[in-house]
Amino acid sequence: MLDTTALLHWPLDRLAGGLCAMSQRGELERLSHARMLLIEAADLRWEQPSEASLDVARRAGAASGDLPRLSPVDLDVLALALDGGHELVTDDYRMQNTARKAGLVVHALATTGAREVWSWVWRCVGCRKEHDVASDAPSARRGNGPDCDVCGSPTQMKRRRG
C-alpha cells in the first residue's frame, strides 16, 4: 500500500503493482500535475475503500489517538491497508503510528521512520484530565480538541503518559 509520498518520490518502476486509494489521485494532482501524468502510465491498482474498512481505520486511529490529525486521504489509505493486511509505505508518522498499533508492517521512504508507537489523548488545559479520542472525532491538522467534560476548558492533543 503506497502513501502519496511514495507516488511523488519513488521511481516509476518501484511503484509497479502498488495499491493506492482513489482519493490519492486528487491529492497527487494538487501537489504535482506533471507527476500525476507520469503516474497514469505506471501499473498501479487504484481502489476505493469500503465503508466497513473506513470504520476499521477510524477505530484504529481513535485507538492510537491519531484520528483527529489524519486526513480523509490518510484514512482511505489506512482502510485499504488494514482491509487487506497490506504493508504500508509512508513517511507520515501519524499513519505509521496508527498502522503499527493496528498490527500492520510499515516501511518508511526517506526518513528513518517512527521508532516507537505512541498513544495520544486530549488533555484538558485546566484540570489536566485526559480524554480518549472518539472514533467520530473530526479531522483537523491543528487546534484544540473538545471542551473538557469536567471543567469546560479546551483540550489539547498530548502523548499519553505512562
Regions found by a protein language model. Name each.
Residues 1-84, 94-162:
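Feature 3881 marks metal-assisted phosphotransfer/nuclease machinery
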Residues 88-89:
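Conserved SAM-binding loop
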